Amino acid sequence: MTLTAPRKHAIEQDQQDALAPYRNEFYLQEGSIYMDGNSLGLLSKRAEATLLESLADWRELGIDGWMKGRHPWFDLSEKLAALNAPLVGGRADEVMVTGSTTVNLHQLVATFFAPSGRRTKILADSLTFPSDIYALQSQLRLRGLDPAEHLVQVESRDGRFLDEADIIAAMTDDIALIVLPTVLYRSGQILDMERLTREAHARGILIGFDGCHSVGAIPHAFHDWGVDFAYWCNYKHLNGGPGTVGGLFVHERHFGTLPGLTGWFGSRKDKQFDMNHTMTPAENAAAFQIGTPHVLSLAPQIGALELFAEVGIDAVRAKSLALTDYMMTLVDQELTAYGFVIGNPRDAKRRGAHLSLEHPEAARICKALKAHQVIPDFRAPNIVRLAPVALYNSFEDVYEVVSILKTIMDEKQYEQFKNEREVVA
């Protein structure tokens, strides 16, 4: 598609956008365009309000805040799990808001990795986020297994994408567990989770997914697909705040499985304060909690998730696709002559919520964008990631970002910066 009047198109799309009013729910910095919601979502006024309410409960109630106040702390994780559940396609009792991404991965692998006989290996991929690999290596070492031999990583054919056929071919009779991303963090490719789950189960293998780059951005059906487990962060697309508590999903057929890592908050609620040294685990995903919840880190999620309950994930996905479609059209029209390559899937069914623009000068281009008050992120060695977020970005934002990129390239403004990443990229 070619747009003869791209700015007019952006204005028209914004005028027709049913989600446009939600932009006012967020703290947007004047003169700045935020395109990094796939790394850290912005603060909403509702998230700020529920954090302040929880602080007020602490101030006014002290320890009674566990059972009283605006948002009682004792069952806050369960309340948030119920709000998370529609976003991942799980039942409320299959979801728990607890831990962090990597802690939850440790918990789930400690629970579901049961090497026996020939099945002693974990299958992952070569493009996943490094922390997942570190955790899998650690879990193997704890079992006395050498990661060099027992961690199998499916290679990418082109450095961008994974082929499900290659993953399925690697599901051999020595694999005990599979852990894969829902969406690749660099290229934004969506894996076919339903197909991979079906193929894994046909071979007697349990499978789990890292949903950090998909939860809050695309619909899921973890329960219906039969996914064994999943885990994700709540600070990217869900706007829960830096380092906020993560989430996990455990399919109901695994209820009653003793968690690999146990702690008192995994107890059945009515038994927790019996203080018995024999644990009575919760009978659902709540059993996978370990310690006391980080209440002030949970609190912003109350307001943040209320927005998703109002809007619905399908509406978020529809606008996200429209934004990224528009951005790809502009990149094709305006930036290919400068050496930019679109490194994400173009097919809407395979594309997550961000664009992956490849360029040899990516690090310097990101710094030049920041000098123009555009916030992207950089992934070595050559990727500029841009994530127009449905709840707070506009089509005109997308137009402005591409226009600024064109100016940067026309005037070679990037040359004043070093082509190396910053400490936090």
Curated annotation (Swiss-Prot):
GO MF annotation terms: kynureninase activity; pyridoxal phosphate binding
Keywords: Hydrolase, Pyridine nucleotide biosynthesis, Pyridoxal phosphate
Keyword Hydrolase assigned: yes
Enzyme class: hydrolase
Gene Ontology biological-process annotations: anthranilate metabolic process; L-kynurenine catabolic process; L-tryptophan catabolic process to kynurenine; NAD biosynthetic process; quinolinate biosynthetic process
Record-listed N6-(pyridoxal phosphate)lysine modification sites: K236
Cited InterPro entries: Kynureninase, PyrdxlP-dep_Trfase, PyrdxlP-dep_Trfase_major, PyrdxlP-dep_Trfase_small
Signal peptide, first to last residue: none
Record's catalysed reaction(s): L-kynurenine + H2O = anthranilate + L-alanine + H(+); 3-hydroxy-L-kynurenine + H2O = 3-hydroxyanthranilate + L-alanine + H(+)
Residues the entry annotates as binding pyridoxal 5'-phosphate: T101, T102, F129, P130, S131, D132, D210, H213, Y235, W264, T292
Annotated GO CC locations: cytoplasm
Membrane-spanning segments: none
Highest taxon, organism lineage: Bacteria
Family in the record: Belongs to the kynureninase family.
Described function: Catalyzes the cleavage of L-kynurenine (L-Kyn) and L-3-hydroxykynurenine (L-3OHKyn) into anthranilic acid (AA) and 3-hydroxyanthranilic acid (3-OHAA), respectively.
Subunit structure as annotated in this protein's UniProt entry: Homodimer.
Protein name, entry field: Kynureninase
Lineage, highest ranks first: Bacteria, Bacillati, Bacillota, Bacilli, Bacillales
